A protein has these predicted regions:
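An anion/pyrophosphate-binding glycine-rich loop and adjacent beta-alpha core
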Residues: 32-34, 40, 48, 54-55, ...
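Glycine-rich FAD pyrophosphate-binding loop
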Residues: 20-43
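Short hydrophobic core segments
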Residues: 4-6, 28, 130, 148-164, ...
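A conserved short coil-to-beta-strand element within the FAD-binding core of flavoproteins
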Residues: 126-138
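Glycine-rich active-site loop/strand segments that organize a redox cofactor
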Residues: 43-93
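N-terminal Rossmann-like FAD-binding beta1-loop-alpha1 element of flavoenzymes
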Residues: 2-27, 396-400
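Glycine-rich loop(s) and the adjacent beta-strand/alpha-helix scaffold that form part
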Residues: 152-198
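A glycine-rich dinucleotide-binding beta-alpha-beta segment and adjacent secondary-structure elements
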Residues: 126, 298-378
Length: 400
């Protein structure tokens, strides 16, 4: 029995780890090394999973969460952690139940797989792109170098995000030729581009702020956390999560930042009055310097229609109310998610209705399997997407 795995990313590598040792395994990847995207995940630290309850893993899937019951319960986050621990990788749990290598090095995760592949005598075909897959009595693969035949094939070629890591969607036309449906690919876990010019705020980081989002005046998101301004918009943990939700939404989208989520309107007004009382002869720009960070003061005052050079003792109650409202609701206009090339993951992929969730085998083509980001499932930030890659890779591997 010989097996081809197309893609040496998280899902493909996990699949190879669990295929029977007596099978002949071939992994194809057009990169020069395995785990290229894995290497950069979690800013090079590799957030391998999340240690929450399994049901919470499922709740942190944005698209087609029902498909994840079998994968997540058959190969749980605890089993993922045990897999790496038993293969010599020590792990640690950080804020938000995020699991990382104790070394903080994604390269150590890749070393685990390198060792496994070596012990299993896996045939690695690096710098070799699969151009064509078709099936008659068996599977035939045409690559940039050669032609091969295989009994079974696992497609783990990834999505369309970060194309320079290899997940560029180049195999998708072959997947459709095999009879499968590819749902539209969109950016997920990405920065958000705004209508407003925020270039002067680039690099400004905000912690413990509230982020709300409204579609046609209906609130669809309300979370507290961190974000950062970019040259064209906003990014950071809260924004990444919101971007995935917005990837499949339409309508009039407004985003609002609550700079003081811990204060009620009344308590914030009391705080402003106290600062005004202490700084009556100063300009409003200087008087509110303790309420928010320096770079946000002028944009806040502009939104509140207050002259920054106006003395505090000249500020009217109407202006003070405006100031309070802007601090509690600094409004921004959504334009789009950042381009797919710059997204952490892609939304879309092979339709889950065409895949058996308990085995990852195609319902259309016998002996064809899918795992990882190529499937139309995407999760929020926090280790959930890698858990999906590992769980589906495991199922594909053990069911070969």
């Amino acid at each position: 029995m010989n097996v081809a795995i197309v893609g040496a990313g998280a899902a493909g590598l996990m699949a190879a780890s669990f295929i029977k040792n007596e099978y002949e395994i071939h992994i194809f990847d057009h990169n020069e090394k395995i785990g290229k995207k894995l290497f950069i995940t979690g800013k090079g630290r590799c957030n391998i999973t999340n240690s929450c309850e399994v049901q919470d893993l499922i709740e942190n899937i944005n698209t087609n969460k029902y498909f994840c019951y079998s994968p997540f319960y058959d190969f749980t986050n605890e089993q993922v952690i045990n897999f790496f621990n038993s293969n010599g990788l020590k792990t640690k749990i950080e804020r938000g139940n995020r699991v990382f290598p104790k070394s903080d090095k994604s390269s150590d995760v890749i070393k685990v797989f390198e060792k496994i592949l070596k012990n299993k005598n896996v045939n690695l075909h690096l710098n070799e792109q699969v151009n064509k897959i078709y099936k008659s009595d068996t599977f035939y693969l045409t690559t940039s170098i050669n032609k091969y035949s295989f009994d079974k094939v696992i497609i783990a070629c990834g999505g369309k995000s970060y194309p320079n890591t290899g997940s560029n969607g180049s195999l998708y036309n072959q997947i459709t030729r095999l009879g499968h449906t590819i749902n539209e690919m969109k950016p997920g876990l990405s920065a958000i581009i705004l209508k407003e010019n925020v270039e002067e705020l680039e690099g400004v980081s905000l912690k413990n702020i509230g982020l709300k989002c409204y579609i046609n005046n209906k609130m669809i998101f309300n979370e507290i956390g961190e974000m950062i301004f970019t040259r064209k918009g906003i990014s950071g943990p809260l924004v990444l999560t919101l971007s995935s939700i917005l990837s499949k939404k339409n309508g009039d989208i407004k985003i609002s930042i609550d700079l003081k989520p811990g204060l009620t309107d009344q308590k914030l007004d009391d705080r402003i009055l106290r600062d005004f009382s202490d700084n009556q002869n100063k300009t409003i720009e200087n008087a509110i310097s303790k309420i928010t960070i320096k770079k946000l003061i002028l944009p806040i005052l502009k939104s509140a229609n207050i002259n920054p050079n106006k003395k505090v003792n000249e500020i009217t109650k109407f202006e003070r109310d405006n100031l309070r409202k802007i601090i509690k609701s600094f409004d921004l206009t959504y334009v789009s998610n950042e381009k797919l090339d710059y997204a952490i993951i892609s939304v879309g992929g092979v339709d889950v209705n065409e895949i058996d969730p308990s085995t990852m085998e195609s319902k259309i083509v016998k002996d064809l399997y899918f795992c990882g980001e190529v499937i139309d499932v995407d999760g929020f930030t926090g280790g959930f997407n890698l858990q999906f890659a590992f769980s589906t890779g495991y199922l594909a591997g053990i069911n070969i």
